[in-house]
Amino acid sequence: MPCQHYQRGDCRSCQWLATPYSTQLAKKQQHLQQQLQKLDCTQIQWQAPYTSILQGFRNKAKMAVSGMVERPILSHPQSEADLTDCPLYPAHFTNIFTILRDFIARAGLVPYNIQKQKGELKYILLTESQLDGGLMLRFVLRSEKKLPLVQRELPGLLAKLPQLKVVSLNIQPQHAAILEGEKEIFLTEQHTLEECFNQIPLFIRPQGFFQTNPQVAQGLYGTAQHWVQELPVHRLWDLFCGVGGFGLHCAQALQTQYPDRIIQLTGIEISASAIEAATLSAQKLGLKQVKFQSLDAKHFALAQSPAAQDDTPELVIVNPPRRGIGIELAQFLNQLAPHFILYSSCNAETMGKDVLHLSDYQLKKVQLFDMFPHTSHYEVLCLLERK
């Protein structure tokens, strides 16, 4: 992927950009295998890595704003160079950024100066849906002082960018390296951006996590769906469920595969906004026996009784943050004894440790998903079966 910013040294976010893609994949696959070398790998069906397109794959831009209000600079937080033509973004983002620069000037959104601790506009967060090209635009501001000016100029912005579905101000008053604050002021009637992967509607909300590589994310969810649809299960837990991507894909596939069977899904996620999005997706799919709750996934699980056999899930899906599920939850899952565990991880090192603690389970399938080309990061999906 040619990138003038990398060549000039303006941005080194893509630290492996000079490495051939086949070599990138080989290094990631080797790293993944190293994390599992302490386990019994004799029964693993290794799937070929799921590859990504190499540019234009990101659906989200997180731009720090600096410079002057008449000529704002939109860059990555670690760079001071204008990066609006970053090749990781779709090519049409460049024109959108041009329109947003003009809006910043018209609304008087003075870029926040970190050294002087003055100014208002800290970040612009732009997300695009692959469903219909709809956009969610968020301005991260220090205060609400510019709200009247933003409201005054908003009709002009919507006329220039009719694909804008959700526009909001996020208020982050602290002088700290924090991306966003708690308060979200919506300027549009619509508060969620609809996406669709594999005929499963998903909803992106402000302050909620959503994968930034939709092509690979769709493959990740679709693979989980494919692995699960033939399993003899009808009760599912989806821990750390986010907006419900894994659980809904699996529940819908099982319901289609076994139309006479009642498929029960319980999804747990600490983010209330993500739970709202997941509930909306379940309603749109018409799934009846689905319950999403805003709770700490670990605390929820540990509060359950492994002896309550009637309610024991046959499949537990875990998609934890980088720290993994930890020893305590792994030991609980050994006691709970679901037939299968589907583990999706963004950190193979902690996943390897977790699977080692899932001593009652045998790894059956493993696949790497290259969600972040040109970097050392990747995601991995594993299917474990009770021994």
Swiss-Prot record:
Q: Which reaction does it catalyse?
A: uridine(747) in 23S rRNA + S-adenosyl-L-methionine = 5-methyluridine(747) in 23S rRNA + S-adenosyl-L-homocysteine + H(+)
**Amino-acid positions noted as binding [4Fe-4S] cluster in the UniProt annotation, renumbered to this chain:** C3, C11, C14, C86
The active site lies at C346 (nucleophile)
Q: Which residues bind S-adenosyl-L-methionine?
A: Q211, F240, E269, N319
Q: Name one GO biological process term.
A: rRNA base methylation
- Pfam families per the record? tRNA_U5-meth_tr
Entry-linked InterPro entries: 23SrRNA_MeTrfase_RlmC (IPR011825), MeTrfase_TrmA_AS (IPR030390), MeTrfase_TrmA_CS (IPR030391), SAM-dependent_MTases_sf (IPR029063), U5_MeTrfase_fam (IPR010280)
* Keyword Iron-sulfur on entry: yes
Residues of the signal peptide: none
Q: What is its EC number?
A: 2.1.1.189
Task: Check the record and name the PANTHER family matching this protein.
Answer: RNA M5U METHYLTRANSFERASE, TRNA (URACIL(54)-C(5))-METHYLTRANSFERASE
Keyword Methyltransferase, does the record have it? yes
Protein name listed in UniProt: 23S rRNA (uracil(747)-C(5))-methyltransferase RlmC
Its source organism is Pasteurella multocida (strain Pm70)
| Record keywords, A-Z | 4Fe-4S, Iron, Iron-sulfur, Metal-binding, Methyltransferase, rRNA processing, S-adenosyl-L-methionine, Transferase
Q: Which family does it belong to?
A: Belongs to the class I-like SAM-binding methyltransferase superfamily. RNA M5U methyltransferase family. RlmC subfamily.
| Cysteine pairs bridged by disulfides in the record | none
Coiled-coil annotation reads none
Q: Which CDD domains match?
A: AdoMet_MTases
Lineage start = Bacteria, Pseudomonadati, Pseudomonadota, Gammaproteobacteria, Pasteurellales
Q: Which NCBIfam families match?
A: meth_trns_rumB
> What the protein does?
Catalyzes the formation of 5-methyl-uridine at position 747 (m5U747) in 23S rRNA.
